[in-house]
Design a protein with these regions (language model features):
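Alpha-helical repeat scaffolds in large eukaryotic proteins
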Residues: 42-45, 211, 252, 360
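C-terminal alpha-helical "lid" subdomain
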Residues: 160-183, 294-300, 304-400
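Alpha-helical scaffold elements adjacent to nucleotide-binding pockets in ATP/GTP-utilizing enzyme cores
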Residues: 36, 40, 66-73, 97-105, ...
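Conserved phosphate/pyrophosphate-binding and hydrolysis machinery centered on Walker-type P-loop NTPases
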Residues: 23-31, 60, 196-200, 237, ...
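A short, basic N-terminal segment
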Residues: 1-51, 371-400
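The catalytic "switch" region of P-loop NTPases
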Residues: 2-7, 179-336
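P-loop NTPase nucleotide-binding core
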Residues: 52-53, 57, 61, 65-217, ...
Length: 400
């Protein structure tokens, strides 16, 4: 009988679209790198010290697959995971937008669907978790807005208010007058905030708060996975520089607790963006008095570790797994020489993605016709990162 889970794995590999399921079952490749990430996750979980890892890779060589593998490893280590691919709809130059997108794509261990705030429903305002988080929000953040907001969230008996306060924690920020009004109704006194809250200036407080909240909830830490970083290169000059400054907050995570952030970047970024668009000169022109964040990120991309192509032995190991999944998916018993399938894969294209697709096409033909035939893939076009879009202020910029 066909195995539907195995069929999903095969179809994901055939399409070339990155899949969490594929990351779960194909973690054997690049064992040294996987071990290093595993050790880093253990260090974060044990000591609570935050860290980061930025790497580059060619198109189709497994950048996103590595993030999916890290996601599986983190969840097995009882860590919360957030995954954010950068896009036009989810840019990286505006921290409030980053926060909203990350919260929307945050997964608790052993959960297939995103979401975590429902775990706070019903927690008493005098519980150990509440006491820890209220003390943290009052003493450790730049502003004390979250102290008042979280207190209201825990104490309100009005469901509509609770949903509005939860929406704030999800990135739809409540106005200060509305928060003060809710606090006065609940506490019977005025909220005296130490610093007026600005979502563009103080949004990092929310990341810090969540990083502490996840460990207070009993999890071993927070893993943030940022994909498609090269799409920063398609934005305008100032937007790119702001994006680098935001990357710096996670690359050097001094304000985050027990957090591990991974950035996946195209290996073309140095040539197509940093050099061709003169990013170091742009940095000096836009932020002449505060160059360190941007320079640190640009230096990190230039010196980043690049994913090496898999060795023949590593490809053979992956293809052996693919043969097993293909047999389960279509309920057949392949009588195959693994070496022959590896040979077909090696001839099928230069990129890992096309090699695996060629191997699957060969298995399809063996299954359907008993003859593998000849499979080949032509050269793939690569995206041009040299074009850019003009800086256009968003509604968030205009309303802040």
């Amino acid at each position: 009988m066909p195995d539907m889970n195995a069929m999903r794995i095969i179809e994901a590999l055939r399409s070339g679209v990155p899949s969490r399921a594929v990351g779960k079952y194909f973690a054997e490749a690049r064992p040294k790198l996987i071990r290093r990430i595993s050790d880093a996750l253990d260090e974060v979980a044990i000591n609570g010290k935050s860290d980061s890892f930025l790497y580059t890779g060619k198109y189709g060589e497994g950048k996103t697959h590595l993030l999916n593998t890290a996601m599986t490893m983190a969840q097995e280590n009882d860590m919360v995971v957030s995954y954010m691919p950068i896009s036009k709809e989810a840019p990286f130059d505006k921290l409030p937008v980053i926060y909203r997108n990350i919260v929307q794509n945050t997964y608790l261990p052993k959960h297939e669907q995103p979401g975590f705030l429902h775990k706070l429903w019903g927690i008493g305002a005098s519980s150990p978790l509440a006491s820890e988080m209220l003390l943290y929000a009052a003493k450790e953040l730049e502003t004390d807005k979250l102290y008042y907001l979280f207190q209201c969230f825990l104490k309100t008996d009005d469901q509509e208010e609770q949903f509005r306060l939860q929406a704030d924690l999800e990135g739809d920020f409540i106005s200060p007058p509305d928060l003060k009004r809710i606090y006065r109704r609940i506490a019977g006194k005025a909220a005296k905030m130490n610093v007026p809250f600005s979502k563009t200036k103080h949004c990092m407080d929310y990341f810090s708060f969540l990083s502490r909240l996840f460990t207070a909830m009993g999890y071993n830490g927070w893993v943030i996975l940022i994909d498609e970083v090269e799409l920063i290169g398609r934005t305008g000059k100032k937007a790119r520089q702001n994006a680098y400054r935001n990357m710096y907050r996670f690359l050097k995570p001094t304000s985050l607790h027990a957090t591990y952030t991974m950035f996946a970047v195209s290996s073309m970024y140095q040539d197509d963006v940093i050099e061709k668009k003169h990013e170091y000169e742009n940095l000096e022109a836009i932020f002449p008095n505060d160059m360190e964040p941007g320079k640190t990120v640009l230096d990190a991309i230039v010196s980043a570790e690049q994913l090496n192509p898999l060795t023949r032995d590593e490809i053979a190991e992956v293809i052996s797994r693919i043969i097993d999944f293909h047999a389960k998916a279509y309920d057949w018993k392949p009588d195959l020489d693994v070496g022959k399938v590896v040979e077909v894969a090696q001839e099928g294209g230069s990129l890992l993605r096309t090699k695996l697709r060629s191997a699957i096409e060969y298995l399809d033909q063996k299954y359907l016709y008993g003859d593998g035939g000849h499979v080949s893939v032509g050269a793939l076009e690569q995206e041009d990162l040299s074009a850019e879009e003009a800086d256009v202020p968003s509604l968030d910029d205009l309303n802040d």
